Regions:
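Stable alpha-helical elements in mature extracytoplasmic
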Residues: 87, 95-96, 100, 162-171, ...
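Active-site signature of cysteine proteases
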Residues: 21-22, 215-461
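Second-shell loop/turn segments in exported
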Residues: 77-89, 151-157, 307-315, 324-325, ...
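Bacterial Sec-dependent N-terminal signal peptides
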Residues: 1-22
């Protein structure tokens, strides 16, 4: 039986285009050399005993790494309360709403307020469902093994996202206070909802392709798509609740005095209290050293709404990005930012430093890839959005450390914030969204370039 499995594996590798080198396996001689390479001396035994009983990070932790990291910052925009995305991938939505909340509370002298993430998530999932189904219609003439079609079926819907999704969502659907539409189990723990929607969409997508293959007209496909979206809408309503079309809300000032009581639609509420032109007033920047700087890139199919905008960004060196970040914080504006947050992040104390964990010493090896190499090999990519809110500068005006407002609840030594070294930021910041008024004119002109279109399955995305 084992021999049959091995033969089948070799056959599948050959059919996939991999030439099987008869010398490529681990033979007895090589295995002997590998065994001999492990010393198993007193030092190895001590490390092995410790690792068998403890988490790797607990033993690799560098207790001195936190030295110099504190809450003293040259420029800091105070947080308006720590939010908690819980077991969901909605960091992008929490971050976008947190940036907006900071501005609204300051401009309107409001007390504590939080906007409903569940409301905007409802429409995010509805829009993403439509994006997938319409893509199935648009690509119906392509063979099923086409790379785009395969990618669509592999990724019918996600709970994650990025800033252009926020811009399209809020501009179209507005916002509501959290008191109007609160969290549910499935908004706070999205895994099962995502699985149900993915299964529903894959089946519906296959049905649309079958209809198209039999010669169905576009009008018939569009009508069928709408019926399918009715099923999606029902699933979302049952799990997240009915999104309000209007609501009555009492505005108070920071002292608790009533300012007004009005009835709003979500769009009216957004226009009156936010009014931000998220689509046109903000620019997304990326630090991707694996690609040419000072160029504009666009990711195909990387949008939340079918009639929305693909993800576009200007690729810049970190020094350029940090200058704009400092200027924004100087002027009291938080920023949407995204990171490879899992690398060298100490969740217990809320710090991010390249010195937090010494894996090299623990395992007697080195991990030497630079940022570009990590991107190219899929070792590093943006995984989490957070709100950039503070920077500390040295005597020469150079950044030493930064702080972000996270959305994992009030945890760690900094009450839900993460303090990071400038070196860590250089390695693991990927995206920053900046208001145009803090972007130099020569950088802003780069937007006029024709974007370089990247496929949805690009290694970084």
């Amino acid at each position: 039986m084992k021999q049959l499995l091995i033969s089948a594996l070799l056959l599948s590798m050959a059919s996939a285009g991999f030439a099987v080198n008869p010398k490529g396996g681990i033979d007895d001689a090589m295995l002997g050399r590998l065994r001999s390479s492990y010393k198993n001396d007193a030092n190895d035994k001590a490390i092995s005993n410790a690792l068998k009983s403890n988490d790797i990070n607990a033993l690799a932790a560098n207790v001195e790494a936190q030295n110099g990291l504190d809450e003293n910052f040259t420029y800091r925009v105070k947080s308006k309360g720590i939010t908690n995305q819980k077991s969901s991938g909605r960091c992008w939505l929490f971050t976008g709403l947190n940036v907006l909340r900071s501005q609204i509370m300051d401009q309107h002298d409001m007390p504590q307020i939080e906007f409903s993430q569940s409301y905007n998530f409802f429409f995010d999932q509805l829009e993403k469902s439509n994006l997938f189904l319409q893509a199935m219609i648009d690509t119906a003439k392509l063979p099923e093994d086409n790379e785009t079609v395969q990618w669509l079926f592999a990724h019918p819907i996600q709970d994650g996202g990025q800033f252009t999704g926020i811009a399209d969502n809020l501009s179209k659907y507005g916002i509501v206070p959290k008191s109007v539409m609160g969290e549910t189990f499935s908004s706070s723990a999205t895994t099962n909802l995502r699985k149900i929607l993915s299964r529903r969409l894959r089946e519906d997508g296959l049905r649309l392709r079958e209809m198209a293959a039999k010669g169905a007209k576009e009008s018939a496909l569009m009508a069928e798509k709408e019926k399918m979206l009715q099923g999606v809408y029902r699933i979302l309503t049952l799990t997240l609740g009915v999104p309000p079309t209007e609501f009555t809300w009492t505005q108070k000032d920071s002292k608790g005095n009533i300012v007004s009581t009005k009835t709003y639609t979500p769009q009216q509420f957004y226009k009156e209290f936010a009014g931000n032109d998220l689509k046109n007033d903000y620019v997304m920047f990326m630090n991707d050293p694996s690609r040419e700087y000072y160029k504009v890139y666009e990711i195909d199919y990387d949008r939340h709404n079918y009639d929305g905008s693909n993800w576009k960004y200007i690729n810049l060196p970190m020094e350029e990005i940090k200058k704009m970040a400092i200027e924004s914080l100087k002027n009291g504006q938080m920023m949407y930012s995204s990171w490879d947050s899992g690398k060298f992040l100490n969740r217990q104390n809320g710090t991010a430093s390249l010195d937090n964990y010494d894996y090299d010493s623990l395992f007697g090896t080195t991990f030497g890839m630079n940022k570009a190499e990590r991107i190219r090999t899929k070792d590093s990519a943006s995984t989490h959005a957070m709100t950039l809110c503070a920077v500390d500068l040295d005597a020469n005006g150079q950044p030493v450390k930064w702080m972000v407002e996270n959305s994992w609840g009030p945890v760690g030594d900094y009450n839900g914030h993460v303090v990071m070294t400038d070196d860590w930021m250089n390695e693991y910041l990927f995206r920053l969204v900046v208001n145009k008024k803090f972007v130099p004119a020569d950088i802003l002109k780069l937007q006029n370039q024709k974007p370089i279109l990247l496929p949805a399955w690009d290694p970084l995305f």
